Amino acid sequence: MESLLLARLPEAYVVFSPIVDVLPIIPVFFLLLAFVWQAAIGFR
């Protein structure tokens, strides 16, 4: 039962692989956005 579920999960997530590839970049993007925003306000 578990082996069937584990075998079927990767095939189900093939559709979401581009989204999963982008997900680790999103926190870095928000961190850079917050840093630029604080720098712009600080240098005003």
Swiss-Prot record:
The entry's keywords: Chloroplast, Membrane, Photosynthesis, Photosystem II, Plastid, Reaction center, Thylakoid, Transmembrane, Transmembrane helix
Pfam family, one: PsbK
Residues passing through the membrane, by range: 23-43
Family: Belongs to the PsbK family.
Gene that this sequence comes from: psbK
Compartment(s) of residence: Plastid, Chloroplast thylakoid membrane
InterPro entries in alphabetical order: PSII_PsbK (IPR003687), PSII_PsbK_sf (IPR037270)
SUPFAM superfamilies noted in UniProt: Photosystem II reaction center protein K, PsbK
Organism: Trieres chinensis (Marine centric diatom)
Disulfide bond entries: none
Parts forming coiled coils: none
Transmembrane helix recorded as keyword: yes
Role summary: One of the components of the core complex of photosystem II (PSII). PSII is a light-driven water:plastoquinone oxidoreductase that uses light energy to abstract electrons from H(2)O, generating O(2) and a proton gradient subsequently used for ATP formation. It consists of a core antenna complex that captures photons, and an electron transfer chain that converts photonic excitation into a charge separation.
Gene Ontology biological process: photosynthesis
Propeptide stretch(es), residue numbers: 1-7
Identification of the protein by name: Photosystem II reaction center protein K
Membrane-topology annotation of the record: Single-pass membrane protein
Entry's Gene Ontology cellular component terms: chloroplast thylakoid membrane; photosystem II reaction center
Keyword Transmembrane: yes
Assembly and oligomerization: PSII is composed of 1 copy each of membrane proteins PsbA, PsbB, PsbC, PsbD, PsbE, PsbF, PsbH, PsbI, PsbJ, PsbK, PsbL, PsbM, PsbT, PsbX, PsbY, PsbZ, Psb30/Ycf12, at least 3 peripheral proteins of the oxygen-evolving complex and a large number of cofactors. It forms dimeric complexes.
